[in-house]
């Protein structure tokens, strides 16, 4: 396989033709795909619709209808055709896209056609994500699994999986450790560990430490390269267009020519001041009004935002990832000119737990999530893509006893009754078994939803309904839902206790008993997380054993 084919293949394995941060869409929905399939295999659209109603998958329909001889398309041929589909625009573009898709389906084998249709629709369903692919890279390009950790570390900085695959194919293990920050290519965010008790904050980070406010907003990474400014989400999505006010504020308030900043965008109460220590902020759900393609200016006025920067990763050609936190914070303070929109995360530096507790209570009074404790040590580097012990989070739920929060993937719906008739009555949710790259059932959530929540969840799940259990999901027969859903939507759930259960498959051992969450309650949709960003089996086991996760 040639170098370019390796790069293109890496993208195609994840159902795209480019890195995640390019927000690539091919502009073909079910309706156009249905027409293209009908044209390619010379059947009526009604016939395609009938088969689609039965299978629930247009890729499977293409496979069924392709009765031609076995052929084999070259990777560059597939990739080139998909790029043509993406680039078709303007008047007559829908017909052009349909024709291009029909053409490549006619040249494809049944299996190739099945996956081409799924890629075009953004529903590849191979049952694995980028982390699984990185493990495959280790074996394919180095001949040894021992490089997996280093490959994942490199991917946290070089988030272009095609570029990473190409470099590994060319240089093998020598490519590792040489990736650096590149403007316009987001770095994976460093995340905070959770502790079980307030006293553990001192055990984990003894002596002097920083306590920062933890904001209930959207994590944002700002890249400024001269006049070009981009904003990226925690999921590496380009969200520049949703926040024109933030981009303009950065243009005016950040004087450095080349800089990468890490922070949180939050919505604040109209009439208040975001930088006022007594000011109040709206929840993350309010902020989601800004995540829209249309009427951006209208919602800029309806939902004003502020950005609180807490780290700096790059400055004028130099990566700052390996510098200790105190140095990075000092550099950050030098380069952020505060304004109505731009702010530095409020913090204190102390070795006194009572002062930290007071600071935590102040944060709760402002409707903030809690606080982040940060190490002031010499080795407190920015660990991209890691949940690091250099940062610890302490939230209201942790302070209230046994209650814990979990980010879970929805994998099924049960029909609702009474007031919930026409919607779901409960959701079957799963954690991620990282070792097996499999979703395992953990709880059934039926409380905490408002009517608006239920309506939004139904809408978001409508495109992900499937006819059978996904290959990467493990469910016991007694828990089979009325409707199967491919893992796509993540919700945050509050629970009180982790118990052993014969009904669930999370961590299921030889005794056929898994782990389950008792008294679950829905808190919110996590638009900022994907199915492979959820709570893991390792984290659940640690909590069950009384350890921190």
Curated annotation (Swiss-Prot):
InterPro entries: ATP-dep_DNA_ligase, DNA_ligae_ATP-dep_bac/arc, DNA_ligase_ATP-dep, DNA_ligase_ATP-dep_C, DNA_ligase_ATP-dep_cent, DNA_ligase_ATP-dep_CS, DNA_ligase_ATP-dep_N, DNA_ligase_N_sf. Transmembrane segments: none annotated. One of its GO terms (molecular function) is ATP binding. It catalyses: ATP + (deoxyribonucleotide)n-3'-hydroxyl + 5'-phospho-(deoxyribonucleotide)m = (deoxyribonucleotide)n+m + AMP + diphosphate. The active site is at 214 (n6-amp-lysine intermediate). ATP binds at residues 212, 219, 234, 264, 310, 387, 393. PROSITE patterns: DNA_LIGASE_A1, DNA_LIGASE_A3. Its cofactor is Mg(2+). Its EC number is 6.5.1.1. It comes from the Archaea. Keywords: ATP-binding, Cell cycle, Cell division, DNA damage, DNA recombination, DNA repair, DNA replication, Ligase, Magnesium, Metal-binding, Nucleotide-binding. GO terms for biological process: cell division; DNA biosynthetic process; DNA recombination; DNA repair; lagging strand elongation. Gene3D superfamilies: DNA ligase, ATP-dependent, N-terminal domain, DNA ligase/mRNA capping enzyme, Nucleic acid-binding proteins. Belongs to the ATP-dependent DNA ligase family. DNA ligase that seals nicks in double-stranded DNA during DNA replication, DNA recombination and DNA repair. This is DNA ligase 1. It comes from Methanosarcina barkeri (strain Fusaro / DSM 804). The gene is lig1.
């Amino acid at each position: 396989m040639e170098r370019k084919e390796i790069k293109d293949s890496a993208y195609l394995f994840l159902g795209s033709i480019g890195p995640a941060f390019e927000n690539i869409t091919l502009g073909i929905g079910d309706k156009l795909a249905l027409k293209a399939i009908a044209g390619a295999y010379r059947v009526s659209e009604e016939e395609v619709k009938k088969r689609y109603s039965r299978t629930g998958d247009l890729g499977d329909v293409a496979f069924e209808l392709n009765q031609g001889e076995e052929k084999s398309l070259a990777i560059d041929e597939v990739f080139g055709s998909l790029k043509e589909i993406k680039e078709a625009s303007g008047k007559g573009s829908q017909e052009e896209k349909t024709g291009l898709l029909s053409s490549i389906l006619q040249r494809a084998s049944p299996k190739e056609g099945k996956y081409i249709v799924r890629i075009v629709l953004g529903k590849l369903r191979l049952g694995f994500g980028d982390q699984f692919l990185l493990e495959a890279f280790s074996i394919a390009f180095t001949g040894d699994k021992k490089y997996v950790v280093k490959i994942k570390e490199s991917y946290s900085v070089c988030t272009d999986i095609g570029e990473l695959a190409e470099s590994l194919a060319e240089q093998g293990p020598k490519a590792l450790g040489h990736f650096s920050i590149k403007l316009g290519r987001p770095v994976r965010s460093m995340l905070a560990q959770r502790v079980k008790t307030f006293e553990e904050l001192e055990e984990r980070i003894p002596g002097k430490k920083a306590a920062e406010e933890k904001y209930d907003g959207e994590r944002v990474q700002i890249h400024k390269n001269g006049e070009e400014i981009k904003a990226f989400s925690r999921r590496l999505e380009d969200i520049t267009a949703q926040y024109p006010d933030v981009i303009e504020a950065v243009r005016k308030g950040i004087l450095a020519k080349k800089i990468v900043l890490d922070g949180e965008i939050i919505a604040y109460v109209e009439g208040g001041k975001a930088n006022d220590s007594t000011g109040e902020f709206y929840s993350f759900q309010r902020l989601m009004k800004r995540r829209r393609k249309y009427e951006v200016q209208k919602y800029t006025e309806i939902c004003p935002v502020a950005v609180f920067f807490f780290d700096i990763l790059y400055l004028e050609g130099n990566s700052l990832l390996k510098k200790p936190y105190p140095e990075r914070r000092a550099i950050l303070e030098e380069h952020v000119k505060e304004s109505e929109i731009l702010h530095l995360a409020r913090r204190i530096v102390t070795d006194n737990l009572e002062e930290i507790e007071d600071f935590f209570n102040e944060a709760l009074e402002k409707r903030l999530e809690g606080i982040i404790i940060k190490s002031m040590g010499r080795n407190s580097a920015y660990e991209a893509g890691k949940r690091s012990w250099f940062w610890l989070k302490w939230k209201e739920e942790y302070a209230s006893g046994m209650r814990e929060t979990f980010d879970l993937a929805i994998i099924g719906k049960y029909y609702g009754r009474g007031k919930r008739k026409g919607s779901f009555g409960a959701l079957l949710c799963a954690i991620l078994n990282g070792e097996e790259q499999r979703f395992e059932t953990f709880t059934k959530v039926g409380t905490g939803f408002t009517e608006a929540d239920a309506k939004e969840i139904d809408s978001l799940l409508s495109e992900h309904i499937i006819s059978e259990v996904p290959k990467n999901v493990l469910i016991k027969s007694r828990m089979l839902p009325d409707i199967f859903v491919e893992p796509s939507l993540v919700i945050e759930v509050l629970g009180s206790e982790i118990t052993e259960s014969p009904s669930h498959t999370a961590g299921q051992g030889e005794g056929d008993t898994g782990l389950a969450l008792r008294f679950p309650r829905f808190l919110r949709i996590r638009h900022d997380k994907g199915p492979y960003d959820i709570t893991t089996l390792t984290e659940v086991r640690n909590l069950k054993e009384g350890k921190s996760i």
